[in-house]
A protein has these predicted regions:
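N-terminal active-site segment of His-dependent metallophosphoesterases
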Residues: 1-73
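His/Asp/Glu-rich metal-coordinating catalytic cores
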Residues: 55, 66-212, 216-229
């Protein structure tokens, strides 16, 4: 029996993202800074291995643009395989920068990776040593604009030991094009933990239940400063 559930929440990786306002630094540093998002995800993967987590939750916007450049794809899949080699499951939702309609990647993911569908909320059991220790719920974006309140579709199943909801959303706005919802909408779903993406600043919106934005692990321009990473 698993004594405790261990997972990492991250998102908004923006692999392959071009950095802005780099013209003032030399080419060597431009190359170093350009690889920073990948290096940040590498550190998250290594932390997952070191902490022997059961799962990594990725809350959307793995990439920045619809083309998903080949280098970014290869980096991402290589690191997913590293998690697979360490028996770590990965659960992912797609966000506004990497919706299903824009996915052109042909590089297959390893079998430890589950990407949630776009047409409905799906419940997936998290099984550790043959025992269901949690249920993960999620729904991805089909298009870059998602005006529907997806939070209204989530509903905890009876008998869940621990329920986690995953969503790429803008909390606090009814007019957003990023799956707008309110904190009360999330609270009413019965989840024990909400893993949210889209906002680049890490923030815990609520503790009962936990409603958490992990933020992005690497700032993408001079306005995104301060400590960044993931939640464990």
């Amino acid at each position: 029996m698993a004594k405790s559930l261990r997972f990492i929440q991250c998102g908004d990786l923006h692999l392959g993202s071009p950095f802005h306002n780099l013209s003032a630094i030399d080419e060597r540093w431009q190359r170093i800074v350009g690889k920073a998002p990948v290096r940040a995800f590498q550190k998250i993967v290594q932390m997952a291995i070191d902490k022997r987590v059961h799962a990594v939750l990725i809350t959307g916007d793995v990439y920045t643009s619809a083309d998903h450049n080949l280098t970014a794809q290869l980096d991402y899949v290589r690191l997913l395989h590293k998690l697979a080699q360490n028996n770590i499951q990965v659960f992912a939702v797609l966000g506004n920068h990497d919706p299903l309609e824009a996915w052109k990647a042909k590089i297959p993911f390893p079998p430890n990776v589950h990407v949630f569908p776009t047409d409905a909320v799906e419940r997936v059991p998290l099984v550790v040593d043959g025992e269901e220790v949690a249920a993960i719920y999620g729904q991805s974006y089909a298009k870059s604009e998602q005006r529907d309140n997806l939070a209204w579709k989530f509903n905890r199943a009876a008998g869940d030991r621990f329920s986690i909801g995953m969503l790429h959303t803008q909390v606090g706005s009814r007019d957003s094009t990023y799956a707008p919802c309110t904190l009360e909408d999330l609270k009413e779903c019965g989840m024990d933990y909400w893993a949210l993406g889209h906002i680049h600043k890490h923030e815990i919106l609520c503790e009962k239940p936990y409603v958490v934005y992990a933020g992005n692990p690497q700032g993408l321009d001079c306005t995104e400063t301060g400590p960044r990473g993931c939640y464990y």
